[in-house]
Amino acid sequence: MPNPLYRQHIISISDLSREQLECLLQTALKLKAHPRGDLLEGKLIGSCFFEPSTRTRLSFETAVQRLGGKVIGFSDGANTSAKKGETLADTARIISGYTDAIIQRHPKDGAARVAAEFSRVPVINAGDGTNQHPSQTLLDLVTIYETQGRLDKLKIAMAGDLKYGRTVHSLCQALKRWNCEFAFVSPPSLAMPDYITEELDEAGCRYRILGSLEEAAEWADILYMTRVQRERFDEQEFAKIQGKFNLEASMLARAKPNLRVLHPLPRVDEIHPDVDATPHAYYFEQATNGVYARMAILSLVLNEEV
């Protein structure tokens, strides 16, 4: 079967078909079970991070090196010609002349699509503002499949900052293709955006609003936690919600045995350390899967056959 991702930009989950997502998922699982060190041999990848990152940057660079490729780039846009006023379009033009693919993170929504428009090589979006984070979504899909044995018709609860969290937006857009059911737990001011719930409606996916993490843990197959950012509230408002969206081990007492708790990390207070010792915690394994997910993306984008 032809590789449906060869020479493709990876910008948004919405751009990818279910067939392409399944190809990425199965390739990630295959590379995890049977690693290969030759798929990027002779390839040079540009790692262009205009804002700080730990897991995403390091796991992408690990993926490149494990596949036999090499990396050039930067980890902070302040030390590039962007600081002098160079446009993103020009940066993409220049770096695409040096490399076989560009991995880009940028603070502005839509920046990845701008880079793709002017790049001569595939652009992989490593996060653009509050918009999209497709490689995170792929590692989430790998983790969900790994823990549940399927993606079809799962119950997915999402908690915390659902308004600004690009990870939960992208994950909803991916899992709607498998007819999953969703539940949302958040402060009213950080509710899931209308455009996401409208997409779920159009796909025929059911969703509900729940009032507590205990309810979510009892209902769900996957509980996807995110951080409620203190800086988005005044002190009085934050005091009202503080702790309400922080998960503790005692809240998992009525959870189904197959429930797994995921988090894009870094966590602060929203998952208590006592959850780490429960059989439901899976966020560190989730982070490890980032390497295999990104190996799959790079392998498929840069090889006709994998």
UniProtKB/Swiss-Prot annotation:
State the oligomer form and interacting partners: Heterododecamer (2C3:3R2) of six catalytic PyrB chains organized as two trimers (C3), and six regulatory PyrI chains organized as three dimers (R2).
Q: Where does L-aspartate bind?
A: K84, R166, R227
**Which is an annotated Pfam family here?**
OTCace
Record family assignment: Belongs to the aspartate/ornithine carbamoyltransferase superfamily. ATCase family.
Record protein name field: Aspartate carbamoyltransferase catalytic subunit
GO molecular function of the protein, one example? amino acid binding
Could you list this entry's UniProt keywords, alphabetically sorted.
Pyrimidine biosynthesis, Transferase
The protein's matches in InterPro entries, at most eight in alphabetical order, are given as: Asp/Orn_carbamoyltranf_P-bd, Asp/Orn_carbamoylTrfase, Asp/Orn_carbamoylTrfase_sf, Asp_carbamoyltransf, Asp_carbamoyltransf_Asp/Orn-bd
Disulfide linkage = none
- Report residues binding carbamoyl phosphate: R55, T56, R105, H133, Q136, L265, P266
